[in-house]
Amino acid sequence: HNSCLNCEATVTVGKRNGLTVVPGMELCTAEDAHTICLFPTVADAMEFHQYVKQHSPVMNNDAGTFGTQIIMNDSDEPIGEETQLLINAANIGIDDVVALVNQYHGAAFPAHIDRSAYSVFSTLGAIPPEANFKAAEITHYADEVCLLREHAELRDKILLRNSDAHYLEHMLEPNAWLALPECTPECLIAALNGEIDITWK
């Protein structure tokens, strides 16, 4: 969370294997609501990373308690360590995220909204209209029909079903597809910003 330091290696490995990787960050907002921030390039992602770092509490990571925050290269080898603790909330309000991420040519949407912790619903009870999100992420456990019934603000948003996996073995098998004019980060970001019409099934 709150870091893009492994984006470059991940994008490089993706290119090597014929995969389109979209660099991004799972931001923890001031409200403790996790938010996905995606960018067209690693350079944009790293500029945003620096902004978030400058607007986060300066606190050293306790590796014994929270684990080592390892930076990897594209050969899956450790090349460094982030010493600033990354799990804390950044001093960035949820109402400001979309406009801020747009400044770095990206798109943002609330993460795992159906989870009982660190989601916009668990912390705020609803998605603030001022936040101007065009999409939202739900987990594979979510009852989409129930969510749409209970939260009217979701009915005009793209709902992306993801695993919220922190380990490879927890990643879902693909069960949905997104029809984009081009298989590029730029095209996905345009769709998530509501700039082009898409089909998501």
Specify the residue positions occupied by each region the protein language model found.
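Charged catalytic cores and adjacent phosphate/nucleic-acid-binding surfaces used
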Residues: C4-M46, A99, Y104-A107, I113-K201
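Active-site gating loops and adjacent loop-to-helix segments of metal-dependent hydrolytic enzymes
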Residues: F39-T83, A126
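Short low-complexity stretches enriched in small and charged residues
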Residues: M59-T68, N88-D95, H112-Y118, F133
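Internal catalytic-core helix/loop-beta-alpha segment
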Residues: P78, E82-D114
